[in-house]
Amino acid sequence: MTMKEAIATVVEGRDLAPAQAAAVMNMMMDGQATPAQIGGFLTALRAKGETPEEIAAFARVMREHTVHVKPRVSGTLVDTCGTGGDGAQTFNISTAAAFVAAGAGITVVKHGNRSVSSRCGSADVLTALGVDISVDPGRQAGIVQETGIIFLFAPSHHPAMKHVMATRQDLGCRTVFNLLGPLANPAGAAAQVLGVYDQKLTGPMAEVLSLLGVSRAMVVFGSGLDEITVTGETSVTELANSRITNYIVTPEQFGFTRAAPGDLLGGDPEKNARIIRAILDGAPGPARDIVLMNAGAAIYVGGRAATLAEGIRHAAESIDSGKAAGKLAALVTATRGAS
């Protein structure tokens, strides 16, 4: 299938077969598609609506073009990468949760990037925390094995994305690539907590993860956040060994007080780093509570807890024992020594 044929198919509202979607993605990743063709295709695809099968096919090709990291560890690799794009301007909740989950014994391979729609992306706050995000991919497996956590900076692992970056920026609207980042973890995480920017995406994205062979996942949308929230209800679509279930969780279920959105606001990287350090040092409040819920989810899908409630208890122990803060310190030391 050529790019022109793919655009014509999608403009007519017809879905692409997985092989067709893969062919299109290969052309974009290999630099064979022109900027006009990429823009036309992405816009038409968004207007049609992406199917789980199409998204999974795109993700498989993106994974094939990835610079991989293959740590030798026992246990499940877990990612806490979300789609972003919720516009809520919170502090970096899933980044803080990654350290807490790691402190509870989860091996975390967090995939992320610099800010796109917020003032501070995961890469930005980690830099402010002292982590060297530019560590060579060839050294990252060793860091995971040593510390139990690594940050996988997307541009270092997805060089083929350079062929579509300018067009994405020119379009200025969400495309399927906003969904693909969390689906292309360079370490091949088998379990994920994946936050999405729209409640309608929880089911389809869980289907995509299942098609991609992910064994355990929670796809979440929390009252406007791409996180499990303490400000209201969170819609969860859970994947467990090909079985998909839908349910709602609330902060009150786990003994937390419902918070106002303003309680979770972040700012620039330095401010967000201060918030995260305070949480890891044991400061109480809504920021701690939301991190506990999200870290608890990572602990749960990673197989260290039988329920989300048990995962949250392990998360609290991780912070209160100092292990979560210890993981941050270990990652800072390891990355600075590896660069």
Curated annotation (Swiss-Prot):
Q: Which Pfam families match?
A: Glycos_trans_3N (PF02885), Glycos_transf_3 (PF00591)
Binding residues annotated for 5-phospho-alpha-D-ribose 1-diphosphate, in chain numbering: 82, 85-86, 90, 92-95, 110-118, 122
- Record EC number: 2.4.2.18
List the Gene3D superfamilies hit by this protein, alphabetically. Answer: Nucleoside phosphorylase/phosphoribosyltransferase catalytic domain, Transferase, Pyrimidine Nucleoside Phosphorylase, Chain C
Question: Which function does this protein serve?
Answer: Catalyzes the transfer of the phosphoribosyl group of 5-phosphorylribose-1-pyrophosphate (PRPP) to anthranilate to yield N-(5'-phosphoribosyl)-anthranilate (PRA).
What catalytic activity is recorded? N-(5-phospho-beta-D-ribosyl)anthranilate + diphosphate = 5-phospho-alpha-D-ribose 1-diphosphate + anthranilate
**Residues where anthranilate 2 binds:** 168
| Originating organism | Methanoregula boonei (strain DSM 21154 / JCM 14090 / 6A8)
Q: How is the cofactor bound?
A: Binds 2 magnesium ions per monomer.
Which residues participate in Mg(2+) 2 binding? 226-227
**Name of the protein:** Anthranilate phosphoribosyltransferase
As for family, the record states:
Belongs to the anthranilate phosphoribosyltransferase family.
Name what cofactor the protein needs.
Mg(2+)
Identify the GO cellular component terms for this protein: cytosol
GO BP annotation list: L-tryptophan biosynthetic process
